């Protein structure tokens, strides 16, 4: 089984790398599942293309920036649609200024891929769209892990 690790990157601390690393280890150790980590895959693409300053292109060369980010979008959505068995998503303040997480959750729902959403916002602030795209909603990662053990162990 393969989990896609969704959640804020662009406006999250260290692109959400720490929580993704913890979840990757837990999934491997407890369920034998692998992951698609968009932080790692995006960094690999940046390294492969020598595009370490791509964020500056948003101001200096918007078309180049858009073209580059579209390649990252394609890579991420392909991972959700064609490779992932389920999506684990952290919904917190880090997703509110971005758009990728919204798209990943929506496209997973549209393709019938389960979305396990860990919500850290007040429930009344959680978008009805995102709530309705989620298969199950959790208050924290411990609840999510208990559920994953029941489902996949």
PLM regions and their residue ranges:
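Conserved catalytic or regulatory cores that recognize and/or transform ribose-phosphate-containing ligands
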Residues: 1-153
């Amino acid at each position: 089984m393969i989990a896609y690790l969704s959640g804020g990157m662009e406006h999250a601390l260290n692109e959400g790398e720490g929580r993704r690393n913890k979840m990757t280890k837990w999934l491997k150790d407890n369920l034998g599942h692998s992951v698609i980590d968009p932080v790692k895959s995006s960094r690999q693409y940046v390294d492969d293309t020598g595009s370490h300053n791509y964020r500056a292109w948003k101001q200096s060369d918007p078309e180049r920036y858009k073209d580059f980010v579209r390649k990252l979008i394609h890579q991420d959505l392909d991972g959700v649609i064609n490779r992932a068995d389920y999506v684990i998503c952290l919904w917190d303040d880090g997703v509110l200024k971005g758009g990728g997480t919204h798209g990943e959750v929506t496209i997973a729902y549209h393709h019938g891929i389960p979305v396990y959403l860990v919500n850290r916002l007040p429930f009344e602030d959680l978008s009805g769209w995102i709530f309705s795209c989620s298969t199950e909603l959790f208050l924290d990662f411990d609840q999510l892990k208990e559920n994953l053990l029941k489902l996949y162990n």
